[in-house]
Amino acid sequence: MKPPIYYPIAIRLAMPIYRYMVHKKSQHLPTYMREVKERFGQTYLPAPTAVHIPVDNLEKKVNKSGCHGRVIWCHAVSLGELNTAYPMLKILLNQGFNLWITSTTQTGFNRASVLFEPLLGTRVNHSFVPVDNLKTIQVFIEHIQPVMALFIETELWANTLYELRQRQIPAVMVNARLTEKSYQSYAKFPKLSTSMMQNLTAIIAQDEASADRFVRLGADKVKVSVMDSLKWSSVHQLSADNQRLIQQVQMWQGVSHRPIWLVGSTHDAEELLAIQAHKKLIEHDPATLLILVPRHPERFDEVASLCQSSTFITHRRSKGERIDPDTQVYLADSMGELLAWYAVCDVAVVGGSFVDVGGHNPIEPAALAKPVVMGKFIKNCEELVDGLSKVSALTITDSASQCLADAVASWLFDEDAAHQAGMAGRQLVVAKENAATKQAEQLLIHLSITDSTTNQSD
């Protein structure tokens, strides 16, 4: 179904503005020229064509006949979406497919470089997502020649979906979610939304409410299915570096026999809330330690200044400082180490949920058997929060320092209760960890149907 006539006109008019925005945001970055060329369809790296042995051994195999070397395009907006999709993408690699990853953000682009580093240039390549101009999209698709396109969670582009449909390339929305707020925004443009819904081959929603909203936007009900969120499978094994870090931290004199709580993936205002709550927890036990892990590296110095102004004795990971017996707040201002810090703490508070961000992934601490506390802004992870709450592994509290302190204290100073909650969460994660396998199998079914249809038409 063709997008309404106003959409391609609006995209063309917006392209100079978008180019300026890219310039303003990325001109100081080493990837700037590459980003400009890729977003506007000028130059791309070669498409992956190599055929390699599986990435790792998987217990469950499906027939890989005819899939070696074929490219699946996966669009993941940023770091979070790519982390979520990673277990499923590994399964597709193990089936013999190659991957082309696109990202909207710099953090997503950088994460792809890390996750797929050994395979880049052979079985995997990545780029910034091209602007949704029809000619640009045609250049991109012609270059990578995908047999399927995957869109992780939320971001869709009408011209892209139309071009994929014209080329009979299946387009699947994976781990799809649609909040009521997003639904209302899409519903303001009914013809545009209907065109996108109609041009999708399938929508794998992560909850019934999202599935219903997609249907109301114009998706055929038969195209929409509901499966457990990929986030249940998204906890990667601790890297060797993280395992070494855990061992090192556990040997530091300032760690043993102390109640430790952590606030991870924090955003502006959440660190102040944590520090205010920490003042109340220290009144209960002066040995209590707070570990802060900000979400964005550009805020590390800002958070450090906040901690130092609080009068708490603060040490920083980026300065090579350890947790000493007198450390009251430890700023883990590093990237790629969040899981290690979760492993060290007794109670985990997941950020992005005390301000209107939508909440980050509670599965990460739950998988490590840590009781979890979150705020009420959880639109990005409602299904996960509901599941963990039902087994009493997670509690929701208000964005007030006393409420946060009380919620943390109920586990931090009750070892048995914390252990019981942590194990309940861990058991739930284990029970649902095959979510990636199930969604990958669904994708392979759609591919086999497409192959069969293509062969018949030939």
Question: Where are each of the predicted segments found?
Answer:
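Nucleotide-activated sugar donor-binding and catalytic core shared by glycosyltransferases
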Residues: 1-458
